[in-house]
Amino acid sequence: MRGKRIAVLPLLTAAVFLFAGAALNHSWASPANSSLGLFEASGDVGTVLHPGSVDYDASTATYALTGSGENIWFKADAFQFVWKKMSGDITLTADISFPTTTGNPHKKAVLMLRQSLDADSVYADVAVHGNGMTALQFRDEKGGLTREIQSNLSAPRRLRIARRGDYVYMALAAAEGEPTVAGGWLRVPLQGTFYVGIGLSSHDKDVVEKASFSKVELTAAAPSAGQPTLYSTLETVAVKSVERQVVYTAREHFEAPNWSRDGSFLIFNRDGHVLRMPVAGGKPEIIDTGFAHRCNNDHGPSPDATLLAISDESQEEHDSLVYTVPIGGGTPRRITKNSPSYWHGWSPDGKTLAFVGQRNVGEAGDDFDIYTIPVAGGEETRLTTAKGLDDGPEYSPDGTFIYFNSERTGSMQIWRMRTDGSQQEQVTFDEFNNWFPHISPDGRWIVFLSFLNDVSPSDHPFYKHVYIRLMPVDTMKAKVIAYVYGGQGTINVPSWSPDGKRIAFVSNSETKE
Protein backbone atom coordinates (compact mmCIF):
# COMPACT_ATOMS: atom_id res chain seq x y z
CA MET A 1 0.00 0.00 0.00
CA ARG A 2 1.24 3.46 -0.84
CA GLY A 3 1.70 6.10 1.88
CA LYS A 4 -0.96 8.64 2.74
CA ARG A 5 -1.19 11.72 0.59
CA ILE A 6 0.25 14.86 2.23
CA ALA A 7 -2.52 17.43 2.60
CA VAL A 8 -0.34 20.60 2.52
CA LEU A 9 2.42 20.81 -0.07
CA PRO A 10 5.20 23.35 -0.32
CA LEU A 11 4.18 26.13 -2.74
CA LEU A 12 6.71 25.19 -5.38
CA THR A 13 5.63 21.55 -5.39
CA ALA A 14 1.98 22.54 -5.51
CA ALA A 15 2.67 24.83 -8.45
CA VAL A 16 4.27 21.98 -10.36
CA PHE A 17 1.18 19.82 -9.84
CA LEU A 18 -1.15 22.61 -10.90
CA PHE A 19 0.89 23.31 -14.00
CA ALA A 20 0.85 19.65 -14.98
CA GLY A 21 -2.92 19.62 -14.56
CA ALA A 22 -2.96 16.19 -12.94
CA ALA A 23 -3.09 14.71 -9.48
CA LEU A 24 -1.70 11.34 -8.49
CA ASN A 25 -4.33 10.62 -5.90
CA HIS A 26 -3.25 7.81 -3.60
CA SER A 27 -5.35 8.68 -0.56
CA TRP A 28 -5.91 5.32 1.09
CA ALA A 29 -8.15 6.16 4.05
CA SER A 30 -11.70 5.80 5.27
CA PRO A 31 -13.79 8.99 5.73
CA ALA A 32 -13.11 10.50 9.13
CA ASN A 33 -16.51 9.97 10.74
CA SER A 34 -18.21 7.24 8.77
CA SER A 35 -17.97 3.54 8.22
CA LEU A 36 -17.37 1.83 4.92
CA GLY A 37 -19.53 -1.09 5.90
CA LEU A 38 -18.09 -4.26 4.40
CA PHE A 39 -14.94 -2.51 3.23
CA GLU A 40 -11.85 -1.06 4.91
CA ALA A 41 -10.60 1.85 2.82
CA SER A 42 -11.00 3.82 -0.39
CA GLY A 43 -8.97 5.88 -2.82
CA ASP A 44 -8.06 6.48 -6.43
CA VAL A 45 -5.92 3.97 -8.30
CA GLY A 46 -3.69 5.31 -11.05
CA THR A 47 -3.51 8.85 -12.40
CA VAL A 48 -6.72 10.92 -12.11
CA LEU A 49 -7.47 14.61 -12.53
CA HIS A 50 -10.41 14.68 -10.13
CA PRO A 51 -10.28 12.74 -6.85
CA GLY A 52 -13.13 10.33 -6.30
CA SER A 53 -15.13 9.68 -3.16
CA VAL A 54 -17.52 7.24 -1.52
CA ASP A 55 -20.57 7.77 0.69
CA TYR A 56 -21.95 4.79 2.58
CA ASP A 57 -25.55 4.78 3.78
CA ALA A 58 -25.72 2.14 6.50
CA SER A 59 -29.52 2.32 6.65
CA THR A 60 -29.85 1.06 3.08
CA ALA A 61 -26.43 -0.64 2.76
CA THR A 62 -25.77 1.46 -0.33
CA TYR A 63 -22.45 2.82 -1.60
CA ALA A 64 -22.55 5.99 -3.72
CA LEU A 65 -19.28 6.37 -5.62
CA THR A 66 -17.97 9.34 -7.57
CA GLY A 67 -14.98 8.75 -9.77
CA SER A 68 -12.91 9.96 -12.67
CA GLY A 69 -10.12 8.26 -14.60
CA GLU A 70 -9.23 7.44 -18.18
CA ASN A 71 -10.28 3.78 -18.06
CA ILE A 72 -9.85 0.34 -16.58
CA TRP A 73 -8.24 -1.17 -19.65
CA PHE A 74 -5.04 -1.71 -21.64
CA LYS A 75 -1.91 -1.79 -19.42
CA ALA A 76 -2.89 0.65 -16.65
CA ASP A 77 -6.03 1.67 -14.80
CA ALA A 78 -7.41 4.92 -13.36
CA PHE A 79 -10.49 4.75 -11.14
CA GLN A 80 -12.02 5.19 -7.67
CA PHE A 81 -11.76 2.02 -5.57
CA VAL A 82 -13.35 0.92 -2.27
CA TRP A 83 -11.79 -2.26 -0.92
CA LYS A 84 -11.05 -4.84 1.71
CA LYS A 85 -7.98 -7.08 1.92
CA MET A 86 -8.86 -10.76 1.74
CA SER A 87 -7.52 -14.12 0.60
CA GLY A 88 -8.83 -17.46 -0.59
CA ASP A 89 -12.21 -18.06 -2.21
CA ILE A 90 -14.35 -14.92 -2.51
CA THR A 91 -17.85 -14.01 -3.67
CA LEU A 92 -18.77 -10.35 -4.21
CA THR A 93 -22.31 -9.48 -5.35
CA ALA A 94 -24.16 -6.18 -5.85
CA ASP A 95 -26.92 -4.33 -7.66
CA ILE A 96 -25.25 -1.61 -9.76
CA SER A 97 -26.83 1.44 -11.37
CA PHE A 98 -25.84 4.78 -12.88
CA PRO A 99 -28.02 7.75 -11.85
CA THR A 100 -27.81 9.31 -15.34
CA THR A 101 -27.49 8.10 -18.92
CA THR A 102 -25.16 10.97 -19.86
CA GLY A 103 -21.39 10.83 -20.12
CA ASN A 104 -19.19 8.34 -21.90
CA PRO A 105 -21.16 5.21 -22.86
CA HIS A 106 -18.22 3.14 -21.65
CA LYS A 107 -17.97 4.53 -18.14
CA LYS A 108 -17.56 1.49 -15.91
CA ALA A 109 -18.80 0.39 -12.52
CA VAL A 110 -17.02 -2.76 -11.38
CA LEU A 111 -16.79 -5.55 -8.84
CA MET A 112 -13.06 -6.19 -8.60
CA LEU A 113 -10.39 -8.56 -7.27
CA ARG A 114 -6.97 -6.92 -7.49
CA GLN A 115 -3.48 -8.02 -6.49
CA SER A 116 -2.23 -4.54 -5.58
CA LEU A 117 -3.10 -0.85 -5.79
CA ASP A 118 -0.59 -0.29 -8.58
CA ALA A 119 -2.16 0.99 -11.79
CA ASP A 120 -0.82 -1.97 -13.79
CA SER A 121 -1.73 -4.67 -11.26
CA VAL A 122 -3.05 -8.14 -12.01
CA TYR A 123 -6.82 -8.04 -11.59
CA ALA A 124 -10.21 -9.41 -12.58
CA ASP A 125 -13.50 -7.56 -12.50
CA VAL A 126 -17.08 -7.77 -13.65
CA ALA A 127 -17.76 -4.42 -15.31
CA VAL A 128 -21.06 -2.89 -16.41
CA HIS A 129 -20.73 0.00 -18.86
CA GLY A 130 -22.90 3.06 -19.12
CA ASN A 131 -24.48 1.64 -22.28
CA GLY A 132 -25.28 -1.66 -20.53
CA MET A 133 -22.47 -3.75 -21.98
CA THR A 134 -21.21 -6.18 -19.34
CA ALA A 135 -17.97 -8.12 -19.30
CA LEU A 136 -15.50 -10.07 -17.22
CA GLN A 137 -12.23 -8.14 -17.59
CA PHE A 138 -8.84 -9.43 -16.54
CA ARG A 139 -5.11 -8.71 -16.61
CA ASP A 140 -3.22 -11.89 -15.83
CA GLU A 141 0.26 -10.42 -15.53
CA LYS A 142 1.55 -7.16 -14.07
CA GLY A 143 1.84 -4.57 -16.83
CA GLY A 144 0.06 -6.82 -19.30
CA LEU A 145 -2.89 -5.99 -21.51
CA THR A 146 -6.44 -6.22 -20.23
CA ARG A 147 -8.68 -8.76 -21.95
CA GLU A 148 -12.37 -9.40 -21.57
CA ILE A 149 -15.24 -11.81 -22.06
CA GLN A 150 -18.37 -9.90 -23.05
CA SER A 151 -21.68 -11.19 -21.72
CA ASN A 152 -24.73 -11.60 -23.96
CA LEU A 153 -26.82 -9.97 -21.21
CA SER A 154 -27.05 -6.17 -21.35
CA ALA A 155 -27.55 -4.01 -18.25
CA PRO A 156 -28.04 -6.79 -15.69
CA ARG A 157 -29.72 -5.84 -12.44
CA ARG A 158 -27.41 -7.85 -10.18
CA LEU A 159 -23.77 -8.82 -10.76
CA ARG A 160 -21.34 -11.19 -9.09
CA ILE A 161 -17.66 -11.97 -9.30
CA ALA A 162 -16.43 -15.15 -7.64
CA ARG A 163 -13.03 -16.70 -7.08
CA ARG A 164 -12.59 -20.45 -6.59
CA GLY A 165 -9.01 -21.57 -6.27
CA ASP A 166 -7.07 -19.88 -9.06
CA TYR A 167 -10.18 -19.30 -11.19
CA VAL A 168 -12.67 -16.44 -11.41
CA TYR A 169 -16.07 -16.27 -13.08
CA MET A 170 -19.01 -13.92 -13.46
CA ALA A 171 -22.67 -14.45 -12.64
CA LEU A 172 -25.52 -12.13 -13.66
CA ALA A 173 -29.23 -11.63 -13.08
CA ALA A 174 -31.45 -9.65 -15.44
CA ALA A 175 -34.31 -9.22 -12.96
CA GLU A 176 -35.22 -10.46 -9.51
CA GLY A 177 -33.43 -13.52 -8.21
CA GLU A 178 -29.90 -14.66 -7.67
CA PRO A 179 -27.26 -14.31 -10.41
CA THR A 180 -26.48 -17.38 -12.49
CA VAL A 181 -23.13 -18.30 -14.01
CA ALA A 182 -22.63 -16.25 -17.18
CA GLY A 183 -19.16 -17.31 -18.29
CA GLY A 184 -15.55 -16.89 -17.41
CA TRP A 185 -13.81 -19.49 -15.28
CA LEU A 186 -10.45 -17.94 -16.02
CA ARG A 187 -7.17 -18.56 -14.26
CA VAL A 188 -6.04 -15.24 -12.77
CA PRO A 189 -2.92 -15.48 -10.56
CA LEU A 190 -3.84 -13.65 -7.34
CA GLN A 191 -1.25 -14.48 -4.69
CA GLY A 192 -1.71 -14.41 -0.92
CA THR A 193 -3.67 -11.38 0.26
CA PHE A 194 -5.37 -9.28 -2.42
CA TYR A 195 -7.89 -6.44 -2.66
CA VAL A 196 -11.62 -7.06 -3.08
CA GLY A 197 -14.00 -4.20 -3.74
CA ILE A 198 -16.14 -1.93 -5.89
CA GLY A 199 -14.93 0.70 -8.33
CA LEU A 200 -15.87 3.40 -10.83
CA SER A 201 -14.08 4.90 -13.84
CA SER A 202 -15.60 7.73 -15.90
CA HIS A 203 -13.71 6.67 -19.07
CA ASP A 204 -13.02 10.39 -19.50
CA LYS A 205 -10.21 11.96 -17.50
CA ASP A 206 -11.94 15.36 -17.49
CA VAL A 207 -15.28 14.11 -16.13
CA VAL A 208 -16.51 12.88 -12.76
CA GLU A 209 -19.24 10.22 -12.83
CA LYS A 210 -21.47 8.60 -10.22
CA ALA A 211 -22.62 5.03 -9.61
CA SER A 212 -24.64 3.28 -6.93
CA PHE A 213 -23.85 -0.14 -5.44
CA SER A 214 -26.67 -1.57 -3.33
CA LYS A 215 -27.46 -4.89 -1.65
CA VAL A 216 -23.72 -5.55 -1.56
CA GLU A 217 -22.74 -8.99 -0.29
CA LEU A 218 -19.14 -10.03 0.36
CA THR A 219 -18.33 -13.51 1.62
CA ALA A 220 -15.23 -15.59 2.10
CA ALA A 221 -16.32 -18.98 0.81
CA ALA A 222 -15.01 -22.08 2.55
CA PRO A 223 -14.06 -24.91 0.17
CA SER A 224 -17.09 -27.12 -0.44
CA ALA A 225 -16.91 -30.89 -0.14
CA GLY A 226 -19.89 -31.37 -2.44
CA GLN A 227 -19.99 -32.37 -6.07
CA PRO A 228 -19.21 -29.56 -8.52
CA THR A 229 -21.94 -27.95 -10.59
CA LEU A 230 -20.87 -28.03 -14.23
CA TYR A 231 -21.56 -25.25 -16.73
CA SER A 232 -20.75 -24.86 -20.41
CA THR A 233 -20.41 -21.56 -22.24
CA LEU A 234 -20.56 -21.08 -26.00
CA GLU A 235 -18.25 -18.20 -26.92
CA THR A 236 -16.66 -16.52 -29.89
CA VAL A 237 -13.28 -14.78 -29.96
CA ALA A 238 -12.09 -12.17 -32.45
CA VAL A 239 -8.76 -13.39 -33.81
CA LYS A 240 -7.42 -9.84 -34.22
CA SER A 241 -8.49 -8.11 -31.00
CA VAL A 242 -8.91 -11.36 -28.95
CA GLU A 243 -12.12 -9.94 -27.46
CA ARG A 244 -14.46 -12.71 -26.36
CA GLN A 245 -18.25 -12.71 -26.58
CA VAL A 246 -20.57 -15.06 -24.69
CA VAL A 247 -23.34 -16.49 -26.87
CA TYR A 248 -24.95 -18.99 -24.50
CA THR A 249 -24.34 -20.42 -21.02
CA ALA A 250 -26.16 -23.37 -19.45
CA ARG A 251 -25.91 -25.68 -16.46
CA GLU A 252 -25.15 -28.66 -18.66
CA HIS A 253 -22.43 -30.11 -20.84
CA PHE A 254 -22.32 -29.28 -24.54
CA GLU A 255 -19.49 -29.29 -27.06
CA ALA A 256 -17.83 -28.57 -30.38
CA PRO A 257 -19.35 -25.58 -32.21
CA ASN A 258 -19.39 -25.17 -35.99
CA TRP A 259 -20.27 -21.93 -37.74
CA SER A 260 -22.97 -22.11 -40.42
CA ARG A 261 -21.78 -21.34 -43.93
CA ASP A 262 -23.79 -18.11 -44.04
CA GLY A 263 -22.54 -17.03 -40.60
CA SER A 264 -26.01 -16.75 -39.06
CA PHE A 265 -26.06 -19.68 -36.64
CA LEU A 266 -23.86 -22.05 -34.66
CA ILE A 267 -24.09 -25.85 -34.45
CA PHE A 268 -23.08 -27.89 -31.39
CA ASN A 269 -23.88 -31.18 -29.67
CA ARG A 270 -25.53 -31.93 -26.32
CA ASP A 271 -26.83 -35.16 -24.77
CA GLY A 272 -26.58 -37.12 -28.03
CA HIS A 273 -28.33 -34.45 -30.10
CA VAL A 274 -27.03 -31.84 -32.54
CA LEU A 275 -28.44 -28.35 -32.03
CA ARG A 276 -28.39 -24.97 -33.71
CA MET A 277 -28.82 -21.45 -32.35
CA PRO A 278 -28.38 -17.89 -33.67
CA VAL A 279 -24.92 -16.35 -33.32
CA ALA A 280 -26.59 -13.43 -31.55
CA GLY A 281 -27.88 -15.80 -28.86
CA GLY A 282 -31.25 -17.28 -28.06
CA LYS A 283 -32.69 -20.73 -27.45
CA PRO A 284 -30.99 -23.78 -29.00
CA GLU A 285 -33.10 -25.93 -31.32
CA ILE A 286 -32.53 -29.64 -31.91
CA ILE A 287 -31.74 -30.66 -35.48
CA ASP A 288 -33.67 -33.81 -36.40
CA THR A 289 -31.18 -36.65 -36.94
CA GLY A 290 -33.71 -39.49 -36.99
CA PHE A 291 -32.48 -42.70 -35.41
CA ALA A 292 -29.07 -41.12 -34.71
CA HIS A 293 -29.70 -40.14 -31.09
CA ARG A 294 -26.20 -40.69 -29.70
CA CYS A 295 -24.32 -38.07 -31.72
CA ASN A 296 -20.86 -37.17 -30.44
CA ASN A 297 -18.77 -34.05 -30.90
CA ASP A 298 -17.60 -34.67 -34.49
CA HIS A 299 -19.96 -32.91 -36.89
CA GLY A 300 -19.98 -30.12 -39.47
CA PRO A 301 -21.81 -28.56 -42.46
CA SER A 302 -20.91 -29.24 -46.10
CA PRO A 303 -19.28 -26.50 -48.22
CA ASP A 304 -22.55 -25.90 -50.08
CA ALA A 305 -24.51 -25.79 -46.78
CA THR A 306 -26.94 -28.53 -47.85
CA LEU A 307 -25.69 -31.40 -45.67
CA LEU A 308 -24.46 -31.94 -42.13
CA ALA A 309 -21.90 -34.65 -41.38
CA ILE A 310 -22.47 -36.32 -38.02
CA SER A 311 -20.78 -39.07 -36.01
CA ASP A 312 -23.24 -41.25 -34.11
CA GLU A 313 -22.95 -44.14 -31.66
CA SER A 314 -26.52 -45.47 -31.60
CA GLN A 315 -25.87 -48.46 -33.89
CA GLU A 316 -23.55 -51.51 -33.92
CA GLU A 317 -22.66 -51.88 -30.25
CA HIS A 318 -22.45 -48.11 -29.87
CA ASP A 319 -19.32 -47.68 -31.97
CA SER A 320 -19.20 -44.37 -33.84
CA LEU A 321 -20.20 -44.25 -37.52
CA VAL A 322 -20.22 -41.31 -39.95
CA TYR A 323 -23.49 -40.19 -41.55
CA THR A 324 -24.83 -37.21 -43.45
CA VAL A 325 -28.24 -35.60 -42.91
CA PRO A 326 -29.89 -32.61 -44.60
CA ILE A 327 -28.71 -29.41 -42.93
CA GLY A 328 -32.22 -28.72 -41.67
CA GLY A 329 -32.63 -32.25 -40.35
CA GLY A 330 -33.84 -35.57 -41.72
CA THR A 331 -32.99 -39.24 -42.07
CA PRO A 332 -29.27 -40.06 -41.74
CA ARG A 333 -27.46 -41.68 -44.66
CA ARG A 334 -24.60 -43.95 -43.60
CA ILE A 335 -21.20 -43.17 -45.11
CA THR A 336 -18.65 -45.39 -43.31
CA LYS A 337 -19.08 -49.15 -43.34
CA ASN A 338 -16.58 -49.74 -40.55
CA SER A 339 -16.46 -48.49 -36.98
CA PRO A 340 -15.35 -46.72 -34.93
CA SER A 341 -15.22 -43.73 -37.31
CA TYR A 342 -15.29 -40.04 -36.37
CA TRP A 343 -15.85 -37.30 -38.96
CA HIS A 344 -13.56 -34.26 -39.05
CA GLY A 345 -13.49 -32.59 -42.46
CA TRP A 346 -15.13 -31.94 -45.83
CA SER A 347 -13.07 -31.56 -49.00
CA PRO A 348 -13.58 -28.08 -50.54
CA ASP A 349 -15.59 -29.57 -53.42
CA GLY A 350 -17.87 -31.40 -50.99
CA LYS A 351 -17.18 -34.81 -52.54
CA THR A 352 -14.95 -36.40 -49.88
CA LEU A 353 -14.97 -36.73 -46.10
CA ALA A 354 -11.89 -37.00 -43.88
CA PHE A 355 -12.30 -38.97 -40.68
CA VAL A 356 -10.48 -40.81 -37.92
CA GLY A 357 -10.89 -44.55 -37.67
CA GLN A 358 -9.64 -47.48 -35.67
CA ARG A 359 -9.49 -50.82 -37.43
CA ASN A 360 -8.64 -54.34 -36.23
CA VAL A 361 -9.24 -53.35 -32.62
CA GLY A 362 -7.16 -55.40 -30.21
CA GLU A 363 -4.59 -56.40 -32.80
CA ALA A 364 -1.14 -55.05 -33.58
CA GLY A 365 -1.30 -51.76 -35.44
CA ASP A 366 -4.81 -50.89 -34.23
CA ASP A 367 -3.97 -47.19 -33.73
CA PHE A 368 -6.42 -44.49 -34.73
CA ASP A 369 -5.46 -43.26 -38.21
CA ILE A 370 -6.63 -40.79 -40.85
CA TYR A 371 -8.97 -41.97 -43.61
CA THR A 372 -10.96 -40.46 -46.47
CA ILE A 373 -14.14 -41.71 -48.11
CA PRO A 374 -16.39 -40.48 -50.97
CA VAL A 375 -19.58 -38.79 -49.82
CA ALA A 376 -21.49 -40.59 -52.58
CA GLY A 377 -20.37 -43.94 -51.18
CA GLY A 378 -17.44 -46.24 -51.74
CA GLU A 379 -14.39 -47.64 -50.03
CA GLU A 380 -12.36 -45.84 -47.40
CA THR A 381 -8.72 -44.93 -48.03
CA ARG A 382 -6.19 -45.09 -45.21
CA LEU A 383 -3.75 -42.17 -45.31
CA THR A 384 -1.60 -42.62 -42.18
CA THR A 385 0.11 -45.69 -40.76
CA ALA A 386 2.57 -44.23 -38.23
CA LYS A 387 2.65 -45.70 -34.74
CA GLY A 388 0.55 -43.73 -32.26
CA LEU A 389 -2.63 -41.69 -32.42
CA ASP A 390 -3.50 -39.53 -35.43
CA ASP A 391 -6.61 -37.33 -35.18
CA GLY A 392 -8.40 -34.17 -36.33
CA PRO A 393 -8.00 -34.27 -40.15
CA GLU A 394 -9.12 -31.12 -41.94
CA TYR A 395 -8.66 -29.99 -45.55
CA SER A 396 -7.01 -26.70 -46.43
CA PRO A 397 -9.43 -24.41 -48.31
CA ASP A 398 -7.56 -24.89 -51.59
CA GLY A 399 -7.69 -28.68 -51.24
CA THR A 400 -3.90 -29.05 -51.32
CA PHE A 401 -3.33 -30.39 -47.81
CA ILE A 402 -4.97 -32.27 -44.99
CA TYR A 403 -3.88 -30.96 -41.61
CA PHE A 404 -4.05 -33.25 -38.58
CA ASN A 405 -2.50 -33.90 -35.16
CA SER A 406 -0.21 -36.83 -34.41
CA GLU A 407 1.75 -38.17 -31.44
CA ARG A 408 4.20 -40.14 -33.61
CA THR A 409 7.18 -38.13 -32.30
CA GLY A 410 6.31 -38.64 -28.62
CA SER A 411 4.27 -35.45 -28.12
CA MET A 412 1.06 -34.40 -29.86
CA GLN A 413 1.92 -31.97 -32.65
CA ILE A 414 0.27 -30.53 -35.76
CA TRP A 415 1.15 -32.20 -39.07
CA ARG A 416 0.02 -31.93 -42.66
CA MET A 417 0.09 -34.10 -45.79
CA ARG A 418 -1.09 -34.12 -49.36
CA THR A 419 -4.66 -35.33 -49.76
CA ASP A 420 -3.41 -38.70 -51.02
CA GLY A 421 -1.39 -39.20 -47.81
CA SER A 422 2.00 -38.35 -49.30
CA GLN A 423 4.57 -35.80 -48.06
CA GLN A 424 3.65 -36.01 -44.38
CA GLU A 425 5.46 -33.22 -42.50
CA GLN A 426 5.44 -31.79 -39.00
CA VAL A 427 4.11 -28.23 -38.58
CA THR A 428 4.47 -27.41 -34.85
CA PHE A 429 7.55 -28.08 -32.72
CA ASP A 430 6.96 -26.93 -29.14
CA GLU A 431 6.47 -28.05 -25.55
CA PHE A 432 2.67 -28.23 -25.74
CA ASN A 433 0.41 -31.06 -26.85
CA ASN A 434 -1.43 -29.58 -29.83
CA TRP A 435 -4.78 -30.82 -31.13
CA PHE A 436 -7.41 -30.14 -33.79
CA PRO A 437 -5.95 -27.77 -36.40
CA HIS A 438 -8.52 -25.58 -38.16
CA ILE A 439 -7.56 -23.56 -41.24
CA SER A 440 -8.99 -20.08 -41.84
CA PRO A 441 -11.24 -19.57 -44.88
CA ASP A 442 -8.48 -17.66 -46.68
CA GLY A 443 -5.94 -20.40 -45.92
CA ARG A 444 -3.54 -18.04 -44.12
CA TRP A 445 -4.03 -19.05 -40.48
CA ILE A 446 -4.24 -22.15 -38.33
CA VAL A 447 -6.04 -22.20 -35.00
CA PHE A 448 -5.59 -25.16 -32.66
CA LEU A 449 -5.95 -26.31 -29.06
CA SER A 450 -2.90 -26.68 -26.80
CA PHE A 451 -2.76 -28.78 -23.64
CA LEU A 452 0.05 -28.25 -21.14
CA ASN A 453 2.60 -31.02 -20.83
CA ASP A 454 1.03 -32.38 -17.63
CA VAL A 455 -1.52 -34.08 -19.91
CA SER A 456 -0.58 -37.28 -21.73
CA PRO A 457 0.06 -36.68 -25.46
CA SER A 458 -2.59 -39.22 -26.40
CA ASP A 459 -5.23 -37.75 -24.08
CA HIS A 460 -7.48 -34.69 -24.50
CA PRO A 461 -9.59 -34.59 -21.33
CA PHE A 462 -12.37 -32.26 -20.24
CA TYR A 463 -11.95 -29.48 -17.65
CA LYS A 464 -8.31 -28.55 -18.09
CA HIS A 465 -6.45 -25.26 -18.40
CA VAL A 466 -5.84 -25.05 -22.17
CA TYR A 467 -4.86 -22.46 -24.77
CA ILE A 468 -6.50 -21.65 -28.08
CA ARG A 469 -3.57 -20.61 -30.26
CA LEU A 470 -3.34 -18.89 -33.64
CA MET A 471 -0.49 -19.38 -36.09
CA PRO A 472 0.27 -18.03 -39.58
CA VAL A 473 0.64 -20.84 -42.10
CA ASP A 474 3.82 -19.30 -43.52
CA THR A 475 5.80 -18.38 -40.36
CA MET A 476 4.56 -21.10 -37.97
CA LYS A 477 4.84 -18.74 -34.96
CA ALA A 478 1.89 -19.30 -32.62
CA LYS A 479 0.28 -16.91 -30.13
CA VAL A 480 -2.45 -17.45 -27.54
CA ILE A 481 -5.80 -15.86 -28.42
CA ALA A 482 -7.81 -17.38 -25.54
CA TYR A 483 -7.01 -18.94 -22.17
CA VAL A 484 -9.77 -21.46 -21.57
CA TYR A 485 -10.92 -23.95 -18.97
CA GLY A 486 -11.94 -26.74 -21.31
CA GLY A 487 -10.27 -29.33 -23.53
CA GLN A 488 -12.31 -32.13 -25.03
CA GLY A 489 -15.19 -30.48 -26.89
CA THR A 490 -13.69 -26.97 -26.95
CA ILE A 491 -12.77 -26.82 -30.66
CA ASN A 492 -12.88 -30.43 -31.88
CA VAL A 493 -14.31 -29.48 -35.27
CA PRO A 494 -14.05 -26.59 -37.80
CA SER A 495 -15.15 -23.42 -36.01
CA TRP A 496 -14.02 -20.40 -38.08
CA SER A 497 -16.63 -17.81 -39.00
CA PRO A 498 -17.10 -17.58 -42.79
CA ASP A 499 -15.44 -14.15 -42.88
CA GLY A 500 -12.40 -15.45 -41.00
CA LYS A 501 -12.72 -12.90 -38.20
CA ARG A 502 -13.85 -15.07 -35.27
CA ILE A 503 -13.54 -18.54 -33.76
CA ALA A 504 -16.38 -20.28 -31.94
CA PHE A 505 -15.52 -22.47 -28.95
CA VAL A 506 -16.88 -23.94 -25.73
CA SER A 507 -15.45 -23.18 -22.30
CA ASN A 508 -16.36 -24.97 -19.08
CA SER A 509 -16.70 -24.13 -15.41
CA GLU A 510 -17.31 -26.16 -12.28
CA THR A 511 -18.44 -24.56 -9.04
CA LYS A 512 -19.10 -25.97 -5.59
CA GLU A 513 -21.63 -23.75 -3.83
Task: Describe these PLM feature segments.
Residues 1-13:
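Bacterial N-terminal signal peptides that target proteins for export
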Residues 4, 64, 102-103, 169, ...:
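Short amphipathic alpha-helical segments with coiled-coil-like heptad repeat character
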Residues 5-8, 117, 142, 166, ...:
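Sequence-pattern detector for short linear motifs
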Residues 10-23:
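Bacterial N-terminal signal peptides
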Residues 28-225:
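Extracellular glycan-recognition regions
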Residues 222-513:
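Sequence signature of WD/YWTD-type beta-propeller architectures
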